[in-house]
Amino acid sequence: MRKIVFVTCLLISSIGFGQIKWITMNKALEEQKKEPKKILVHFFAQWCGLCKRMENQTYQNQEIIKYVNDNFYAVKFDAEGGEKVEFNGRTFTNPTYDPNREIKYGGNGSRNQFADVLGVRSYPTMVFFDEKANLITSFPGYRKPKELEPYLAVIATDEYQKIRTQEDWEKYIKNFNHQVKE
């Protein structure tokens, strides 16, 4: 009887503690060919405090985890790291990347070419691609779960195609039905 109670408690305690299924950009592009889905790339730097906060708070929110996993291939990309990306017939690297480098606030001036070509200049930055790996848009800056939710939804539902002005965006936000309770 104690075993049953223990196992039941263990199962109940593990429900809802999922994680975002982070994969590499190359893996996301490969998966997208088999099962089309939008891609969310979370660009970060190891020294970035707001990136860590977003990873430890925003991306730990259960509603955000579920929404991201259901609607996107999620890529966590170290913009100053050495990951090699094959994208649109080109290879992107960080030619001056040194895995033994000292990590210091403000970076070391060595950015991955993939981040550069997408115009990523600050961290964190989220970049979104459609189901055919075409760039949709990017959103720089830290977002709390409730702040991030409408950005995810506007991309996932293709509502972004209807938003042309700041007024359109403000109307979208005003009418947005939040699931995140914070």
Describe each PLM feature range.
Residues 38, 93-102, 111-127:
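Structural micro-motif
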Residues 35-49, 74:
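Short active-site neighborhood of thiol/selenol oxidoreductases, capturing the structured segment around
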Residues 21-39, 68:
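A short beta-strand-turn-helix
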Residues 52-69:
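Typically the conserved alpha-helix immediately C-terminal to a functionally engaged Cys/Sec
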Residues 119, 130, 136-182:
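Non-globular targeting/processing and membrane-anchoring segments
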Residues 67-87:
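Structural microenvironment flanking redox-active thiols in thiol-disulfide oxidoreductases
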Residues 1-20:
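Bacterial Sec-dependent N-terminal signal peptides
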Residues 46-53, 124-127:
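C-type cytochrome heme c attachment motif
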